[in-house]
């Protein structure tokens, strides 16, 4: 089933975290719809800013929106005017006091969502799909990832019949929960129809601490407690 389930959702609570960080059973339907509208609005508003993900938190009656982008200058704007404008627009949508944080993605070539959007952008410019896929894989592997897989589906190259093509390099252990696999999906709107783009990037594995490391951590905690009592 590893090939069928979403690579991020299966790892939530293990090595991945939620992108909507709140819990309210009574208002859950309204909050889910509101989060969706905020994300759609920001993705359309910041098309040129290379936005990878948007994390929404709801501490109390406030709203905290964190925008992860590879081009923070476009979002912030001159003298912070861009971010202030975004804050006011979100407050108008939600009627809640809003805080906006900008998080910079320093290595966009290993971000699966940004990689898929870049492929879709180049496909819309009629660049050969195999060349685009190879370039994306080369850049990611040169950045030190352990594996990458790129898949495109649709009327590739203007063909009459839609088909699926994919390229892969390195390992993509989808069924290994400790594997940090990033996943991204985008669509290219071409004159011949839509082309779907999927990207999987295997960055590293998370291993549990050994008994020796856990014992050392416990010793540090005990030493800190002792020092606090003596102080």
Swiss-Prot record:
Single GO molecular function: mRNA binding
Superkingdom of the organism of origin: Bacteria
KH type-2 domain location: 38-106
Keywords: Ribonucleoprotein, Ribosomal protein, RNA-binding, rRNA-binding
SMART domains noted in UniProt: KH
Gene Ontology, cellular component aspect: cytosolic small ribosomal subunit
InterPro entries cross-referenced by the UniProt entry: KH_dom, KH_dom-like_a/b, KH_dom_type_2, KH_sf_prok-type, Ribosomal_S3_C_sf, Ribosomal_uS3_bac-typ, Ribosomal_uS3_C, Ribosomal_uS3_CS
GO BP, sorted A to Z: translation
Similarity comment: family membership: Belongs to the universal ribosomal protein uS3 family.
PANTHER family listed in its UniProt record: 30S/40S RIBOSOMAL PROTEIN S3, SMALL RIBOSOMAL SUBUNIT PROTEIN US3C
Subunit structure: Part of the 30S ribosomal subunit. Forms a tight complex with proteins S10 and S14.
Function: Binds the lower part of the 30S subunit head. Binds mRNA in the 70S ribosome, positioning it for translation.
Protein name: Small ribosomal subunit protein uS3
Lineage of the species this protein comes from: Bacteria, Pseudomonadati, Elusimicrobiota, Endomicrobiia, Endomicrobiales
């Amino acid at each position: 089933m590893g090939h069928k389930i979403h690579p991020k959702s299966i790892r939530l609570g293990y090595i991945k975290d939620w992108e909507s960080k709140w819990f309210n059973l009574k208002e859950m339907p309204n909050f889910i719809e509101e989060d969706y509208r905020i994300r759609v609005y920001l993705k359309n508003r910041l098309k040129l800013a290379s936005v990878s993900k948007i994390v929404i938190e709801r501490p109390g009656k406030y709203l905290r929106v964190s925008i992860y982008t590879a081009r923070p200058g476009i979002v912030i704007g001159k003298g912070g005017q861009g971010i202030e404008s975004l804050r006011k627009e979100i407050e108008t949508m939600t009627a809640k006091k809003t805080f906006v944080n900008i998080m910079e993605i320093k290595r966009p070539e290993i971000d699966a969502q940004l990689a898929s959007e870049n492929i879709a952008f180049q496909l819309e410019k009629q660049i050969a799909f195999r060349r685009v896929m190879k370039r994306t894989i080369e850049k990611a592997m040169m950045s030190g990832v352990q594996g990458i897989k790129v898949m495109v589906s649709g009327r590739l190259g203007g063909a009459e019949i839609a088909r699926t093509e994919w390229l892969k390099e390195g390992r993509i252990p989808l069924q290994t929960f400790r594997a940090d696999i990033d996943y991204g999906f985008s669509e290219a709107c071409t004159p011949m129809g839509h082309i779907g783009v999927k990207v999987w990037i295997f960055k590293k594995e998370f291993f549990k601490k050994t008994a020796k490391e856990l014992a050392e951590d416990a010793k540090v905690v005990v030493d800190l407690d002792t020092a606090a009592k003596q102080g």
